[in-house]
Amino acid sequence: RDRSPSRGLGDVYKRQGDHGWEEVPYWLKGYGDLAYILKDSAMIAETKVWIEAAIQSRQPDGFFGPVNERGGKRELWANMVMLWCLQSYYEYSGDKRVLTLMTDYFKWQLTVPDDKFLEDYWENSRGGDNLYSVYWLYNITGEQFLLELARKLHRNTADWTNESDLPNWHNVNIAQCFREPATYYMLSGDSADLQASYRVHHLVRRIFGQVPGGMFGADENARLAYIDPRQGTETCGFVEQMASDEIMLRMTGDPFWAEHCEEVAFNSYPAAVMPDFKALRYITCPN
């Protein structure tokens, strides 16, 4: 797919494009980080085109990016991905416009009524990513309203604390969202929040994880009785699990998460991508 700035800016920032604007932030999230790590000037220049477009898309009310409404509610999931892109860019560049943009955007989020906040399936499942970005900004600016927003995000995000009745069994959501209670623990200080993330992780492996490589049998969704080696996990699930493991390690200091990340990275992920990284499998199964 052509992601050149001349085509992409028109499709993604001026119009909704093929899939809202989720696709570009997903790509940029990895591309930008690679650019900064490799210090590749051409990649950094291309990354900045998209970063500049995001910053310049800020609206008077604090919202940024294309407006994609569902039932009168603004969809927030794609913005969560773009926030991580902006955070990486700030850590590389120190560009304070990122802090201004995120501060204004989070102030806007605080004005949205609870009954119109995190209502869509994806954003409701994955509100923990938004919460993590709020912490990131708070640790730089220390603005107290961010903690109020953190509480609002937690109470409106799907409940990942109930191991007997998960909000959904989508493999990527499980890999990405099980850490939300532990993320909230950083504010609440309630050990029950921290332990909930451990319990969900172990529950899924106990029921669906009798496969090598650190993941679990799910295909698209984990289903009871479908637990043999013919069931697999999406490549997206591998990536989000590794990200969650890294974040859990950062929050807890528990080497268990480093070991689990290594298990997925070296035993599952390589089989999901071509050697040149130009193609990938949607689902990878042990057998």
Ranges and model annotations:
Residues 20-36, 74-90, 123-139, 170-186, ...:
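Well-ordered alpha-helical segments within folded domains of soluble proteins
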Residues 194-195, 205-287:
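Extended polysaccharide-engagement surfaces of secreted carbohydrate-active enzymes
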Residues 14-17, 35-154, 160-163:
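Extended ligand-binding groove/face enriched in aromatic
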Residues 55-63, 97-98, 141-148, 192-193, ...:
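Proline-centered turn/helix-capping motifs that create local helix->coil transitions or kinks
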Residues 2-9, 13:
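Single conserved hydrophobic/aromatic residue that forms the stacking wall/gate
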Residues 23, 65-71, 75-78, 121-130, ...:
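Short, solvent-exposed turn/loop segments enriched in Gly/Ser/Thr/Pro and often Arg
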Residues 140-148, 152, 166-183, 187-195, ...:
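Extended ligand-binding clefts on enzyme/binding-domain cores
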